[in-house]
Each structure stands twice: as structure tokens, then as C-alpha cells.
Amino acid sequence: MGEVAGGAAPGPPRSGLVSIIIGAEDEDFENELEANPEDQNSQFQSLEQVKRRPAHLMALLQHVALQFEPGPLLCCLHADMLSSLGPKEAKKAFLDFYHSFLEKTAVLRVPVPPSVAFELDRTRPDLISEDVQRRFIQEVVQSQQAAVTRQLEDFRSKRLMGMTPWEQELSLLEPWIGKDRGNYEARERHVAERLLSHLEEMQHTISTDEEKSAAVVTAISLYMRHLGVRTKSGDKKSGRNFFRKKVMGNRRSDEPPKTKKGLSSILDPARWNRGEPSAPDCRHLKVEVDEKPGPADRKGSLGISSRDRTVGTPGQDNPGVSLHPLSVDSLDSREPGVDTPQEPGDTPPQGPTSLEPLAPPESTEDNGETESPEPGDDGEPGRSGLEQEPEEPPGWRELVPSDTLLGLPKNQVKRQEVISELLVTEAAHVRMLRVLHDLFYQPMAEGGFFPLEELQNIFPSLDELIEVHSLFLDRLMKRRQESGYLIEEIGDVLLARFDGAEGSWFQKISSRFCSRQSFALEQLKAKQRKEPRFCAFVQEAESRPRCRRLQLKDMIPTEMQRLTKYPLLLQSIGQNTEEPAERAKVELAAECCREILHHVNQAVRDMEDLLRLKDYQRRLDLTHLRQSNDPMLSEFKNLDITKKKLVHEGPLTWRLTKDKAVEVHVLLLDDLLLLLQRQDEGCCSSHTSRTLTPTPDGKTMLRPVLRLTSAMTREVATDHKAFYVIFTWDQEAQIYELVAQTSSERKSWCALITETAGSLKVPAPASRPKPRPSPSSTREPLLSSSENGTGGTEAAPADARTERILNDLLPFCRPGPEGQLAATALQKVLSLKQILLSTEEDSGAGPPRDGDGVPGGGAPGPTHTQEVEENLLSLEVVIKQLEELEEEFCRLRPFLSQLGEILSPNLAAPERSAQTGLS
């Protein structure tokens, strides 16, 4: 059946094969099937055979892209491309390979072996050594072999049935196999170019995910260029997340078939915030070329320049095609065009001398302008040089004289590499902040998507951060230039940034920006759900080349990520610094960075807590509290927990009776303990809360909102997960039995409740308690106006103020005779004194002396011990009630003062009339 398909399959006949109609009576039928030259001479027996034949590989890639998951095959091809690079280029290329195939968020992610995934999760990819990188790539490729083999088998079987693409084009190439190698390779590249162009036109049919389709075409285009195939629009897309095209043309034009020289500059260090010294050289070459206007007119014949010129400006990107505009690739998309007109000839390109004059026509003034903004942010003069000048850690070696480099000790070499990494990553961070500002913040403001005040809350202090980081980068660049690329002293530059007033200002603006991350992401996510126009704007902006295939949600946390890197980099610099004074400066700067990071982390936690409290406040149902007649709950009828500080939260079990328990979610605030019922039992983090007011067995009602000023905790002896929380009001005390999930959680809850309650105690009777910092004054204004609620209002009328103050005074009303608490406490003290005196009398006259042989030695018996413990516990409860009363008195004084100011005019008139009557 395979022979029938091979000889009589529909479609164009394959030249080089004799079409023979074989009848069923032919006795040699089986033998001819076994000797089928189609199987013996197939170019698709293995990936090693097909990956060096561009046209055949294009047919295979199109089949796989439309029928299978193309990630494994593309991963193997790109790994083969990396194997041809030198050590330095391979280390830089591994970053792009990681972000394209290994990263968890990669569009073309492939299954990664567990051992490799574990190492990648715990180590930054740019810090992995070259040997480990090669080992990782080998293991990843080996894990993809099974999938690639299945895809090849499927392609071969479908080809025998005439169901694979481009059979007619491939059949035209087969007569040339083994004849004229140069002519055959030129024809193969020419056919592959046509097939690639067709694949780019049908890009939308590869996948329903537009981003994935573009990534597949980008990866294919890159490997085709590696094989010497001229690419057009694919070059502009390929800068999205793969390899560098900028310098590649100048080098690959020397010898297109030789992959090592061509790929030495394929990877774009600026894509992943890395630089290399060759980048300024390429820029310098382009500037020299741009000064020659003569050959610029020639590129019109290539049919490429007009498209490349239009993609350099940000405002002209086509929102419908996410990957097409990429000004960085304009140079490369033209440079292969110089190679390939010579490739169809019988002889391959001769070398750099024959092609050097052809390189300048491809770099014109227009394209020079479109290419330079990409690495250095569009439309910003001077940024391109700043973006390209920093080198990746291995790159600084090329700027230092070889004799000087050989004489450096190992720790000095390590120090210079870390300093170079600090400079490079700082330049990349500045670029990312400018992308946030230019592509998102400004267009959002101009497009009216958010009010200006709310937009400033989403991107707070962005301009200040750009200014601060740019200044720091300029100082580093200046120091590197002054020192001849071998920086000896950097401590003063670091201290000028992270210490003193500059450090305080940096801490303030970075805290403001980082603390809004959660809020900003929620606001942007909600806006995208509600407004399709905004969603389209974000997607179009994210498709810009400057975004490096990162989404907006990935760019917002960049400042926080940068702050975490500073202490590590500075610590490494200090460890490799020998001079004591310089080392002390660097270590001091590292300590300042750690303090800044600690402050920012705390600000982030506080803001996240505030956002959670706002969510709880929105879900909180206070209806039952408002309907309650309990005077202790009256102050909580309009409870606003967003004014509080969240100390701890978590699920607990509230044991109401021996046989009844309720699952609650407990919020420990700075002065309150809230017991909230979860309605959605399946999810603790997104539930709707409702306050509980159970009254089991007709006893005194247990309140779900409790003040911590009179709180105590005790562990339950019979249950290692349970604990008591004891609250006292007037002459009553209520005990809440709560059960944690583990014993460690119980200890944590007890410690936090005790610590929080202890911080509320008044230190002295005459001293006024220090007011707690209000979150509304420190955190609330940072949110949008819609989240903040109503702003400040004018002073209320006297009647309203009076009623408000009376409502505030209501919680201080206490039933029962005055002085009862003090009398009870005094009685408890006298009882304890009497017990202790009676114990001493029973044990003999006078206090016991050391070495007395009297049995008991003055120690009380079991009955006396139990009685003393009971009296001490009851005395402790009364003392806590007295402390609470003392604190309430201190809080009562300002209310009485305000009430006196309101009532004094009304009381003054009757007093004056009475005095007049007496006179």
C-alpha cells in the first residue's frame, strides 16, 4: 500500500522516481516495496539529516506547527544553534533560550526534566556556569527526542500518502541532489525563502493564540537565518523574545553557511538587559554608513526598506499584528538580503572583502534612526548610547588591556564582573521604567482611561524613580569611564545613592511605588474586564518590541525585584574588595540597601493588609450588631476595620459548648478581635463574612467583636490545639475557647494576642495614652478616591456634634456602684495576705531558714496552694478591669472637654440671668 501511495498518490509526481503501475499479479510486488528508493533516500529519516536542508526543514516545520505542539522541535533546533557558538556568546544565548523554552511563562515552554527545573528555580539563569548550561541544554534536548521522533514518523507516513505540504517544490530539488553542491544549496535556500514567506502569511492559522503563532514564526525565521535563508517580516518579529539580529548581518554576511561566525552576534544582549562591547562598535559602524547617502536608494529594489522604515516609530504600530513592528530587526532583515542575491549562483559568498562594500547600502539614515531608539527607548536622545554602553560581566575584559587583565588576581576579576553586572542591570532597569512611562503611563493619561489622581496611584512616583535610577546609572558610567574600565573605588558612588538624605528619598519613593503593586494590578485587571478599549490598548502596547515580550503585570514588580538585587550585588563587591576603607564603604552601602529593602517590604505588607481589610469591610454584614441591644456592641454598629491595623488572621474553630462548634475566620486587629463566619467553606481567602452572636443555653451572649484591652490567653491543658481567650467587662468575664489547626498555630495565636493586648496598656495613671497611628492618615490617601470614600467635610453643627460625642460617651457608661472594682481588688489582696500569714504561723514562728529540718520548711500544703492560685487568678482579672477603667478614663477626658466647649455657651446664658435676678 505504501508503494501505491508512493507511485500513484494524488499530487505532482516526484522527479527522479520512475512511475510504475504494479499489478496485483506481479510476483515482485513485495520485493519492490522493500526496495523503495523513496524510503532509502528520504531526507526525513532523522532530525540530523533534515535540519541542514532549509526547504525540507520548512516543510517539516509547517507540518508540525499545524498538527502538533512545535515547542519540542524548535527547542532542539535552537539548542543546535547554541552548540555552534563560542563560550561567551553561548552564555548570553542561554538567557534567550531560557526565556523562550524553559521559563514557566514561556509561550513555547517545553517539558523540563525535574532535575533541571529544580536548579533553574533556585538559581538565576544568568548566574549558571557555562558547563552547567551545556548540561542543562543536553538534558532538555534528550527529553524532547521522543516527541520529535514521533513527529518525524508522522511526517514520513503522511508524505507517503501525499498529505504533506510543498511536495511539488521539494520534488524540483531532488534531481540536483549529489550533483552541484553550490547550485543545489542556493536553490534550496531560494525555495526555503518562498516557503517561509508563505508561512508568515498564514501565521494566524497556526494557533488560536496570536502570541503563540507569532512566537512560532519568530523561532522558525531565526533558525532559517541561521541556515542562510533570507527573511523579511519574520526578522521584525523575531526580536520579540529570541535572538539578536542587529550585529548578525555584518558578521553572517561574511560566510552565510558557517554558523559559528554568523551566530556570534545573533543573540541580542539588550533584549534581556545585558550588554556587550560589540554593541557600540555596531552602532559606530552604522553611523559611518549613514553618512553615505549614495547607496541608500538601492534598498528600494529589495522591497524591504519601506516596511522597515515605518516600524521604528511607536505611534505607527499595527494593533492587529502584535509582533510585526520591531525596529531593532530592520538592519538584519536587510543584511541577509545582501547575501542571498549572490547565493543563487554556483559559488558561495567569497568572504568579508567581497561583501564589505555591500553592507553600507543596507544601513541608511532612516533605518539608522528606527534602529537606535529600540535599545535605548524610542524618541529619547542619548538613551541609545546609555543602553548599549554597559557590558555584560564577561564583556569588560575586552575593554581592558590583555597584559593588565592577566595580572589581575582572581578576586579582583570577580569584583570587576560584579561591578559590570551592577552597571548593566541598572541600565536595563532604567530602560524598563521608561517603557512603563512611555508606553503605558503617558498613553493612559492622554487616552483618559483613568483620572489623573487615580493613575498616579497606580504608577506613584514613577518620574522620580526614573530620575533617581538614571542619576545613579550616570554616576556609574562616569566612574567607569574615568577609571579606564577597571573600577577601583565605587564605595563613594554607592553611599551617595543609598545613604543619607539621598537614601531616605530613594526609600520613600520606592516604598510608595512598590506598596501599590497589588492595588495597581487589581485596578488594571478590573479595568481590562470592564472596558474592551482599554484591554485592546494594553495588548497593543505589550506587543511593542520595547516590552521584550513582557506583559504589564510583569513590568510593575520590576522595582521591587531591583531592590532585592542591590544587597546581593553590593555584598559580593565588598567580599572581593581588599582595601579596608573601600570595603567598609561598600559594606555600609549594602547595609543601607538592606534597610531600604526592609522598609519597602514592610510598606508592601501594610498596603496588602489594608487592601484585605477593605475587602473584608466590603463583605462585612453589621446588621445583627445594629439590631442588638447590648451596650457593649453599640460602639461597633458602624465599625470600620479599614481604620485598624491587621496583625494576624486565619481560620479557627469556636467551641460554643461541649457539643457545638462553629468554624470562624478570626481577624486580630491592633485593638480588636473579630470572629467572622465563613459562608463559602471551600475557600478561606475569598469568602463573605457575617458576624456571629450566639447565645448558647440562654447564658450571657458571647460577642463576636472583642476589645483587646482586657484580653488574656490561656492554653487548654487537655487539648494541645485549643486555647482560651478571656475578656472582662465590669463584673463579668467571658471565656472563648478557640481551636487552631496545629499546636504551633495555637502558640502563635496566643503570643500575638498577648503581645497586642499588652501594647494597649496605659503605662501610668496620669499619662495620657499615646494615640495609635491611624492607617487612614498614613496609608489611606495612597489609594484612589473611589477607594478612600468621601473626603473631609466642614465642621458639623453644634447639635450634630453633641449627639456624636454622646454616642462616643455611651460605651463608657458602667452600671453598678462606684468603687466596687477597687474594693474587690483590696479584698482579694487582704485574703491573700491572711492565707500567707496563716501558712507561716502553721509552719512555725518566723520565716523559714535555710537548712531547717522542719517538715514542709514553710511550704504551704496542697489546699493552701490551690486557694492561693484561685485568689491570684481572680485578682488578676480585677486588676485588668482596673487597667481598662484607667485607660477609658484617659480616653474620656478629650470627649468631656469637647462636650464642655459645646455646652458652655448654653449654660452661660441661664447663669447670667440668675445673677441678674439676684442683683
UniProtKB/Swiss-Prot annotation:
Gene from which the chain derives: Arhgef1
Keywords: Coiled coil, Cytoplasm, GTPase activation, Guanine-nucleotide releasing factor, Membrane, Phosphoprotein
Post-translational changes noted in the entry: Phosphorylated by PKCA. Angiotensin-2 induced Tyr-736 phosphorylation is mediated by JAK2.
Gene Ontology terms, MF aspect: G protein-coupled receptor binding; GTPase activator activity; guanyl-nucleotide exchange factor activity
Taxonomic lineage: Eukaryota, Metazoa, Chordata, Craniata, Vertebrata
This protein's name: Rho guanine nucleotide exchange factor 1
Sequence ranges of Low complexity compositional bias: 775-787
Disulfide cysteine pairs (residue numbers): none
Domain PH: 645-758
One GO CC term on file: membrane
Organism expressing this protein natively: Rattus norvegicus (Rat)
